[in-house]
Regions:
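Regulatory hinge/linker segments at domain boundaries
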Residues: 1-14
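Short helix-to-turn junction characteristic of helix-turn-helix DNA-binding domains
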Residues: 13-20, 67
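Recognition helix of helix-turn-helix DNA-binding domains
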Residues: 21-62
Length: 83
């Protein structure tokens, strides 16, 4: 199954898993998005990774859990980018 995850999606999911806030993620080196764009990207990921019936009330924690379950991010290799 291809969820069409790009580099920025992976970085967003990885840093959410590490406990970064959206504001902290926007300040990462090479992350060309503001908070609104990060929120839009997060909502887009929710739409791609959850069925219509599962999407209600999905927060960042649940999104990260799904990404781990689908092996989009690897719990054993969660390293932050250089800031």
């Amino acid at each position: 199954i291809n969820y069409d995850i790009d580099e920025y999606d992976e970085r967003l999911l990885r840093h959410l898993a590490l406990g970064y806030t959206k504001e902290m993620i926007t300040n990462l080196k090479g992350m060309p998005f503001g908070v609104k764009s990060i929120e839009k990207r997060q909502n887009d990921l929710i739409n791609r990774l959850f069925t219509i019936n599962e999407r209600s009330g999905v927060n960042a924690c649940r999104l990260v859990t799904r990404a781990l379950e689908l092996r989009i991010i690897d719990i054993d290799n969660l390293e932050p980018d250089e800031e």
